[in-house]
């Protein structure tokens, strides 16, 4: 009997699960919206909600806990400086999960997980900056 055994294993080892959710949380903080399978989105939600709550606390210990969880100081800075103030007046419920049909290859249920009141201009901003930098670099080499 599996009484009291919360959480999905997702057919992965515990270290793989931990790394995967750290990467997914980092991607969600960076892009504010990601597409994944429905079970992964449902498991990711409490992890990200706790990270935003750490950001709202804002002290040094909370910052170090967030760095330990997502392993990226730049994303922790974004979490504490932009996301936490945005949700300062909201008590939980920082993310939303929307069902997004089924994946063609294996018919897995897909979902979009995003921050409530997200900034749409953030999605793809890193890619735009990279493309602009490459174009500027090519122009400099051509000159």
From Swiss-Prot:
<comment type="subunit">
    <text>Part of the 50S ribosomal subunit. Contacts protein L32.</text>
</comment>
<comment type="similarity">
    <text>Belongs to the bacterial ribosomal protein bL17 family.</text>
</comment>
<dbReference type="InterPro" id="IPR036373">
    <property type="entry name" value="Ribosomal_bL17_sf"/>
</dbReference>
<dbReference type="Pfam" id="PF01196">
    <property type="entry name" value="Ribosomal_L17"/>
</dbReference>
<dbReference type="GO" id="GO:0022625">
    <property type="term" value="C:cytosolic large ribosomal subunit"/>
</dbReference>
<dbReference type="InterPro" id="IPR000456">
    <property type="entry name" value="Ribosomal_bL17"/>
</dbReference>
<keyword id="KW-0689">Ribosomal protein</keyword>
<protein>
    <recommendedName>
        <fullName>Large ribosomal subunit protein bL17</fullName>
    </recommendedName>
</protein>
<dbReference type="InterPro" id="IPR047859">
    <property type="entry name" value="Ribosomal_bL17_CS"/>
</dbReference>
<keyword id="KW-0687">Ribonucleoprotein</keyword>
<dbReference type="GO" id="GO:0006412">
    <property type="term" value="P:translation"/>
</dbReference>
<dbReference type="GO" id="GO:0003735">
    <property type="term" value="F:structural constituent of ribosome"/>
</dbReference>
